Amino acid sequence: MVTFLMASPFTHFILRNRCTSRMKKRALVHGRSNIPAQASSPIGKDFDPRGYRRGLGATNKYTRKFLNDPDAKRRMEDEGIGYSTTGLVAQIKEKNFAHTKEGVTIKLADSYGFCWGVERAVQMCYEARKQYPTKEIWITNEIIHNPTVNMRLSEMGVNFIQETDGVKNFNPVKSESVVILPAFGASIDEMKLLADMGVMIVDTTCPWVSRVWNSVDRHARKQFTSIIHGKFEHEETIATASFAKTYLVVKDIKEARWVCDYILNRGATKTEFMRKFKNAHSDGFDPVKDLDAVGVANQTTMLKGETEAIGKLFERTMMEKHGVQNLGKHYFVTNTICGATQERQDAIRKLIDEKPDIMIIVGGFNSSNTSHLQEISEVASIPSYWVDTADRIDTESNRISWKTSCGEMRETENWLPQDSLTVGITSGASTPDKVVENVLEAIFKSRAKMKVRCTINNL
C-alpha cells in the first residue's frame, strides 16, 4: 500500500545560494519606466501614491468592490477554477482528510491551495465579465500565477496586455474598455495611466498586498528607505516599490547581510554596491545616505521565517550603528507577512517531520509561493516533484516532468515505485482544487497501469 499525505504545520527559512542555477529572469524595466510616457502625465517627486489610489475610489471609473456573486462562485467550481464542494478533494475532506484507492491512501492537509485573496480576485473577474457583457475587458498581467485559471479567463474573452522587453503595450486599450488589475496588484504608474485613459478599472488587488503598500507608504512619510524582501522582477514587488519613495529590494538573507555589512562599513565600495543591486533600487538611490533609516516590508509570497530573519538583522544592524536609544529614528517595522502564505508554509512542517518518501507540489511554474513550498521540501532532502498540471505525469511510462525551486526543468523515469511508500502532496495559493484532483487521478492511473504491467510480466 502507498500512503499519500497532504501537508499540515513547519517552520524553516532557506538560503537559496545553494542553487546551481537561477530561474530565467524576465527583462523587466524595474519601477515606473515600463509605462509609455506619452500616454499619461508624469509623476512628480511629491506625488502621493496611496492618496491617489484612494482618490480613485471617489470616481465612477474605479471599483474594488467584491460582489460575492453566488452565480460567479458556482461557475468557477463548475469550470474547475474554484474550490471543490463535490469533487475528490471535497470527498477527502469529508472523510476525515483521508481517501484510499488503488492501494493508495491520501491524507489531505487543512491548509493548501486557493487562498482567500486569490479566490476573491478570480471571482471578481467572473463578476466583471457578467457585469460588463458587451465591453472589451483587459487585464494588466496574469490574474494569478496559474496557467489553468488564466487560460479560462482568456476563453471568457478577457484580453491580456502584451509585454515586450519589459514594456507593456496599452495601445489596444480603448477608453470605453474595462481593465482588471490582478491579485498581486499593479504599479501606481499603471493605475494613473489607466485613469488618464478614462477606462473602467476593476481592482482585484489582494488586501494583504494593499497592507504592504500601506507599510511602505508609512516608510516614505517618515523619510525611511523601504527594504523590500522580494524578487525585483516579480509583479507584486514592482507594484509595491511604486508606492515607496526610496527602496531597495533584497531577495534573501544573504543579500540582506551584504547590505548590512555595507551599512556597518564592513563590506564593498559604493560602486560595487550599485553594481550588485543595479536592477533592485529606486531612481537616484544613494546607499551612503539612503541606508541611514530603513523600514522592512516583503513580497507576500516570500518565506515567512526569512522575512522575519531579515527584519531582525536590520534591527540589530541599526542598533549597532546608531545605538539602542536611537533605534526608532533609524528602523521601522510592521508585520506584512501574509497569513495565507504563512499557513501554507506551516502546513508542510508536520509532513516533513513525518519523513515522507516523496513530495508532490502542485502549482503554476511562475508562482513564487509554490516555489517556496518546493524549496522547503528540497532543503529537507526529500525527493520532491513540482508540477503545474497533471499533464506532467506520463501514466503510460511512469515518467514525470517537474521543476526545481531554482527553475530547472527535469524529467524522472520510474518516479513512482511499486513498493510501499509515503508521498506528501500540497499546492500553492494560486492552485484550484480541480488541478490537485487531476494530479491525484494521474497518480491513481499510474499505479493501476503499473499493476497491469506487473501482472503481465509475471505470466
Residue ranges and their predicted role:
Residues 1-29, 39:
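N-terminal chloroplast transit peptides
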Residues 39-459:
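The feature marks the mature, well-folded catalytic cores of soluble enzymes
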